[in-house]
């Protein structure tokens, strides 16, 4: 009965009244107010200096990182037999290591909070607040310590990493260059997330990191490829420059995995809009796609838009896109196995 209830994170922005209805004495801290925990709990370590990375040690067995995924082990076994790496690479492409931020061998670094965008459907800004970058020295301190601990895969976390530095006089490419130099190019960095428009604006400066494989992954959510839908989402209706960047990555075979997210069933979406999105996905050749059914969020601009797509139709449209994606993944894995076996046979013949 003497315990104190503290509710924070995104919930206070959406459910404050409900929380207080259940627990009138609860302390409510908005996301931007989390530093107040220092005083509430008499913290020995200030909140602002706490690392985002939740796993301080490599997961290991007999001093070697292991993975219990049977499919991945099969791919690795075929690679060993064929003296190649096609199958494991194809596995990473076809699954995108979907939950790689949960992998024990990755080191996560929070580099920014919030998003400068104003998408009509998004509640992130309400829950987290205005965009702000994390101090670069603090980021590099974590990066250096991660290297010392033996990590070589780092994930930059944030709601909009592409905007990093705009409020503190630096840029994402400058941060990446510093990381590259510090690791002597021996580490890899994954970016979660970067807005398509920002990626386009930074593309010329980012290409070298894609080409070298230093940036081995990024997630950039297009949400839709329909100008009409994008306009209602309060996003740039011209997705073509972004598609051309993705095509350039594909043409040059840059070793970077491309991940996107789409929303199906946004108010006003019609079948032609879905086809435009599918065509964009085909052209971009993303290695992984998250398909989300639209659902309104209270207090957002889209909350008042009339829903025009039934739940049944949303599920059908999402299933259509998902099925196409699965066919692509299967073809990719089969081609990788075939290539490995043919290369192995050729080496044996020689």
Predicted feature residues:
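Structural detector for short beta-strands of small beta-barrel domains
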Residues: 339-346
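Structural recognition of alpha->loop->beta junctions
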Residues: 21-38, 176-186, 208-217, 276-288
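Short glycine-enriched, charge-decorated loop/helix-capping segments at active-site entrances
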Residues: 128-129, 231-238, 304-310
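Short acidic, glycine/proline-enriched helix-loop-strand junctions
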Residues: 164, 185-187, 301-319
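Short low-complexity, flexible loop/linker segments enriched in glycine and/or proline
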Residues: 144, 170-171, 304-306
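Conserved SAM/AdoMet-binding glycine-rich loop
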Residues: 14, 147-272
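Short, amphipathic alpha-helical "lid/cap" segments that border enzyme active or binding sites
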Residues: 34-38, 136, 140, 173, ...
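Proteins enriched for Cys/Gly/acidic motifs involved in redox and nucleic-acid/cofactor modification
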Residues: 1-157, 240-247, 251, 283, ...
């Amino acid at each position: 009965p003497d315990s104190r209830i503290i509710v924070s994170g995104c919930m206070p922005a959406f459910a404050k009244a409900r929380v207080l209805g259940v627990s009138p004495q609860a302390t409510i801290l908005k996301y931007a107010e989390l530093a107040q925990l220092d005083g509430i709990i008499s913290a020995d370590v200030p909140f602002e200096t706490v690392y985002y990375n939740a796993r301080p040690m490599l997961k290991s067995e007999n001093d070697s990182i292991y993975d219990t995924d049977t499919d991945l082990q099969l791919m690795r076994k075929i690679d060993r037999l064929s003296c190649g790496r096609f199958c494991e690479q194809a596995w990473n492409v076809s699954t995108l290591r979907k939950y790689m931020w949960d992998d024990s061998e990755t080191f996560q670094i929070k580099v920014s909070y919030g998003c400068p965008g104003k998408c009509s459907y998004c509640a992130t800004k309400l829950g987290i607040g205005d965009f702000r970058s994390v101090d670069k020295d603090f980021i590099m301190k974590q990066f250096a310590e991660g290297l010392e601990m033996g990590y070589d895969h780092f994930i930059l976390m944030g709601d909009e990493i592409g905007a990093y530095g705009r409020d503190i006089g630096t840029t994402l490419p400058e941060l990446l260059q510093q990381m590259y130099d510090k690791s002597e190019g021996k580490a890899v960095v994954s970016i979660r997330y970067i807005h398509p428009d920002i990626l386009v604006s930074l593309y010329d400066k980012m290409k070298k990191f894609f080409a070298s494989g230093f940036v081995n992954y990024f997630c950039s959510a297009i949400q839709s490829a329909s100008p009409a839908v994008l306009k209602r989402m309060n996003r740039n209706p011209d997705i073509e420059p972004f598609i051309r960047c993705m095509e350039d990555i594909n043409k040059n075979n840059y070793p970077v995995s491309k991940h996107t997210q789409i929303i199906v069933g946004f108010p006003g979406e019609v079948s032609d809009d879905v086809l435009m999105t599918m065509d964009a996905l085909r052209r971009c050749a993303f290695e992984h796609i998250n398909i989300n059914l639209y659902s309104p969020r209270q207090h957002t601009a889209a909350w008042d838009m009339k829903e025009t797509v039934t739940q049944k139709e949303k599920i059908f449209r999402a299933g259509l896109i998902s099925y196409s994606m699965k066919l692509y993944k299967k073809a990719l894995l089969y081609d990788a196995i075939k290539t490995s076996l043919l290369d192995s046979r050729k080496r044996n013949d020689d």
